[in-house]
Amino acid sequence: MEIQFLGTGAGVPAKHRNVTGIALKLLDERNAVWLFDCGEGTQLQILKSSIRPRKIEKIFITHLHGDHIFGLPGLLSSRSFQGGTEPLEIYGPVGIADFVKTSLRVSQSRLSYPLKFIELTKENDVIFKDKQFTVRCNILDHGITSFGYRIEEAAHEGELQVEKLQALGIPSGPLYGKLKRGETIVFDGQEINGQAFVGERKPGRIVTILGDTRKTKNSVTLARRADVLVHESTFNKHEAKMAKAYFHSTSQQAAEVAKEAQVKQLILTHISARYLTKEAYQLQEEAQEIFPNTKIVKDMDIIEIPFANEGGA
């Protein structure tokens, strides 16, 4: 599991930062990619990455401002043009279906795959769940309807302790599969309980990706004990009044959310073009005053999300 940042800028594309596009790469987990927001130029950024559009299984839109959705019609059309046939689901605020359907209709674009819309209307709602993942959403504070998303991975079964089995002379093969499932087998007249040879279950990972927002209690709820929190940082710590007026957050407000939620790592994105490279890293330093494990990302950065016992992100 890893996150690739296709665009880390705010408002409009800039020379060094495209507008928002975040890919949660679940290739090992389900051979799929989930995309969070799709600002103008996102598909060009995808071309610079290893992501294949046909692998995009779900798209989660945080809100309907242009810097988060203007790249969507083009990406959907290109996915079809490139031979994509796998179904695609789009989650987002009420209006996302109308935006996409109107864009496709006016441009006379036809898709080669089924497209399903799930428009969100409830706070603190489970919007997707299967054996692997649960996705929750909650409303943020951005003037227009804006959502944050919490992706919870189910626990992983413990590893089979092969060395212990080999010490008993049990050969690899079908018996290992039964033992891995916790079944009891008979080997050389002795009962072997598989549960005694399977390690502890690994807790699933949690990723929280927030849309544009002021600091709000819902942000803390969504981020509670997450392995990674992706939070906007549109303004520096000296511009709190401006952040409030424009329904955005400062670097230190993002850090306060991370600290209150007890997350493991804070990722800052949605960086204004007013902050060049040096000034942008000052945002990181400001946040680190409150939450040390903070990183500001640039376009195309990849953040790996290991299991808890494999070290920090």
From Swiss-Prot:
Its EC number is 3.1.26.11. It holds the Pfam family Lactamase_B. Its cofactor is Zn(2+). It catalyses: Endonucleolytic cleavage of RNA, removing extra 3' nucleotides from tRNA precursor, generating 3' termini of tRNAs. A 3'-hydroxy group is left at the tRNA terminus and a 5'-phosphoryl group is left at the trailer molecule. Binds 2 Zn(2+) ions. The keyword Zinc applies. Zn(2+) 1 binds at residues 63, 65, 142, 212. Zn(2+) 2 binds at residues 67-68, 212, 270. One of its GO terms (molecular function) is 3'-tRNA processing endoribonuclease activity. The active site is at residue 67. The keyword Nuclease applies. Transmembrane segments: none annotated. Keywords: Endonuclease, Hydrolase, Metal-binding, Nuclease, tRNA processing, Zinc. NCBIfam families: PRK00055.1-3 (NF000801), RNase_Z (TIGR02651). Zinc phosphodiesterase, which displays some tRNA 3'-processing endonuclease activity. Probably involved in tRNA maturation, by removing a 3'-trailer from precursor tRNA. Homodimer. Belongs to the RNase Z family. This is Ribonuclease Z.
